[in-house]
Design a protein with these regions (language model features):
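Long, charged alpha-helical interface segments
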Residues: 2, 7-92
Length: 92
């Protein structure tokens, strides 16, 4: 399990942390409107994400205070969004 790829339609979702994995969010359609990311290292609110500008690459799930299992919350108003959780390489 080096990568987990999911496709989301407009709505609200939780993406659970996998130890040692990064989180990338990529617009599958031309644009994803109203993207909000909370509980991640890099958070955004009501952002426009396009497939021409990879703004959502290499994030990390940080979670919220008091959580037993860490997750990030994502929501968006239109478009389709790919999430890619990739095992981070630590040995060079």
């Amino acid at each position: 399990d080096r990568e987990i790829i999911r496709l989301y339609r407009a709505g609200s979702y939780r993406i659970y942390d996998r130890e040692g994995f990064s989180l990338s969010l990529v617009a599958y359609t031309d644009k994803v409107e109203g993207l909000t990311i909370k509980g991640a290292k890099y958070e955004v609110e009501d952002c426009l994400l396009t497939n021409a500008f990879p703004l959502g690459i290499s994030n990390v799930v940080k979670g919220f205070d008091g959580q037993d299992r860490k997750y990030a919350e994502i929501s968006f108003k239109s478009g389709y969004l790919l999430s890619v959780q990739s095992k981070m390489v630590t040995d060079f």
